[in-house]
Amino acid sequence: MVRLVITYDIRKDKIRNKLFRLLERYGAWKQYSVFELEINPVHKVELFHSIADLIEDTDRVRIYDLCERCQGKITELGEVSPDKMQVVI
């Protein structure tokens, strides 16, 4: 498995929403325009192609591949991540 952090800056709402839904299928929404994913290498390649097909030249997507050692050094400060919020009905 590979752990990725993906950030994006997408101008058009329609494309940004599509990218959000795509990334949501693969991982956890952490902050506005930031996702963490843990996927296998085959899905990683598929995801990269899907992102490239979706975005426009003016859009930006950054992908950080986290090594095992780096994963243990993640620090979270402030509000709880959206994926850790609990919904009470």
Swiss-Prot record:
InterPro entries: CRISPR_associated_Cas2 (IPR021127), Virulence_VapD/CRISPR_Cas2 (IPR019199). Its EC number is 3.1.-.-. Keywords: Antiviral defense, Endonuclease, Hydrolase, Magnesium, Metal-binding, Nuclease. Its cofactor is Mg(2+). Mg(2+) binds at residue 9. One of its GO terms (biological process) is defense response to virus. GO terms for molecular function: metal ion binding; RNA endonuclease activity. Belongs to the CRISPR-associated endoribonuclease Cas2 protein family. CRISPR (clustered regularly interspaced short palindromic repeat), is an adaptive immune system that provides protection against mobile genetic elements (viruses, transposable elements and conjugative plasmids). CRISPR clusters contain sequences complementary to antecedent mobile elements and target invading nucleic acids. CRISPR clusters are transcribed and processed into CRISPR RNA (crRNA). Functions as a ssRNA-specific endoribonuclease. Involved in the integration of spacer DNA into the CRISPR cassette. Homodimer, forms a heterotetramer with a Cas1 homodimer. NCBIfam families: cas2. PANTHER family: CRISPR-ASSOCIATED ENDORIBONUCLEASE CAS2, CRISPR-ASSOCIATED ENDORIBONUCLEASE CAS2 3. This is CRISPR-associated endoribonuclease Cas2 2. It comes from Methanospirillum hungatei JF-1 (strain ATCC 27890 / DSM 864 / NBRC 100397 / JF-1). The lineage of its organism: Archaea, Methanobacteriati, Methanobacteriota, Stenosarchaea group, Methanomicrobia. The gene is cas2-2.
